């Protein structure tokens, strides 16, 4: 599975790189698209030691530092992985607030994918605060725009997740929520 990075900033929305069009054209019909959304405290794209250069990294020559695509078994010929990078730095409160506008940007990206790649199923994977971005994005999408959602250690209040789960997009897809005790405070409200 090829990997394309989508940069998001509050002012201009998601920036679709030129290589995305090339990667989409090279896909076989029905090949999956997998959108990876990181969580709290990842560096901005202009910072040199950005951790998501590791977690979103395609398969390396050595296997000591496996990124999400390789750990998920996403081979280069299977489909297209899109890493959605958003500003989740600063205090937890500030990053939590940034999740809402990032969700709007993610929804725009997914709507664009629905237009330019309508025959490719989309899976969203959100980790930690990235799960809030994913669930909030579902609220602005049409039915069947997403096939699967995987939430890993979601940082999203239960009430907000339940509201998002009632959206047409959420009703038309499978949602898997992998939990841990580390985020139990978010399950209360």
Model-found features: residue ranges?
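Serine-dependent carboxylesterase/thioesterase catalytic core
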Residues: 2, 34, 44, 49-73, ...
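Surface-exposed acidic, glycine-flexible loop patches that form ligand/cofactor-binding
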Residues: 23-28, 113-117
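Flexible, charged surface loops at secondary-structure boundaries
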Residues: 26-30, 169-170
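Short beta-strand element of the alpha/beta-hydrolase
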Residues: 31-40
């Amino acid at each position: 599975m090829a990997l394309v990075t989508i940069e998001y900033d509050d002012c201009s929305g998601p920036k679709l790189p030129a290589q995305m069009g090339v990667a989409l054209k090279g896909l076989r019909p029905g090949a999956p698209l997998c959108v990876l959304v990181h969580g709290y405290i990842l560096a901005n794209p202009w910072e040199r030691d950005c951790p998501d250069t590791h977690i979103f990294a395609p398969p390396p020559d050595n296997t000591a530092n496996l990124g999400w695509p390789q750990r998920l078994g996403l081979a280069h010929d299977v489909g297209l992985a899109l890493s959605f990078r958003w500003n989740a730095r600063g205090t937890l409160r500030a990053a939590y607030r940034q999740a809402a506008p990032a969700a709007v940007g993610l929804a725009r990206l997914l709507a664009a994918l629905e237009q330019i790649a309508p025959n490719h199923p989309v899976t969203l994977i959100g980790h930690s605060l990235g799960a809030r971005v994913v669930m909030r994005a579902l609220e602005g999408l049409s039915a069947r725009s997403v096939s699967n959602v995987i939430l890993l250690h979601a940082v999203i209040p239960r009430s907000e997740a339940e509201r998002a789960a009632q959206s047409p997009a959420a009703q038309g897809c499978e949602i898997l929520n992998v939990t841990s005790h580390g985020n139990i405070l978010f399950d209360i409200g």
